């Protein structure tokens, strides 16, 4: 499992484009993600998405801290707890994948990206 950085161009009308990246899972599948700073992350961004908490080493290489999925029902306390935990673990970025068709596909993506951990798969 590894990150593959993507080059982005300016958005429409010259606005900055959302930083994009991709993660390659154990299966070889690639998952494109939007990159968000962990500090000001909005909990609503986690709804119906796969979220990868990331920290970078001194050379800029991404290290996955945790990966989880969240369904559409609001579970703000659990989401906030997960966010607090990954921030304390050094996560500075949250990579959000929104292209999964439903909860089963999001769970499969988490399994594909997951490393051996006791972290919950869903928050």
Task: Set out the residue ranges of the language-model regions.
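GIY-YIG nuclease catalytic motif and its immediate N-terminal context
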Residues: 1-82, 103-123
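Structured alpha-helical
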Residues: 100
């Amino acid at each position: 499992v590894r990150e593959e950085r993507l080059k982005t161009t300016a958005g429409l009308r010259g606005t900055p484009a959302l930083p994009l990246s991709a993660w390659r899972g154990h299966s070889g599948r690639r998952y494109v993600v939007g990159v968000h700073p962990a500090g000001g992350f909005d909990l609503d961004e986690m709804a119906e998405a796969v979220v990868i908490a990331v920290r970078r080493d001194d050379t800029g290489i991404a290290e996955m801290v945790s990966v989880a999925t969240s369904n559409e029902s609001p579970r703000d306390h659990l989401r906030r707890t997960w966010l607090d935990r990954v921030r304390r673990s050094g996560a500075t970025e949250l990579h959000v994948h929104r292209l999964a068709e439903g909860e089963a596909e999001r769970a499969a993506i988490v399994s594909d990206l997951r490393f051996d951990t006791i972290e919950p798969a869903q928050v």
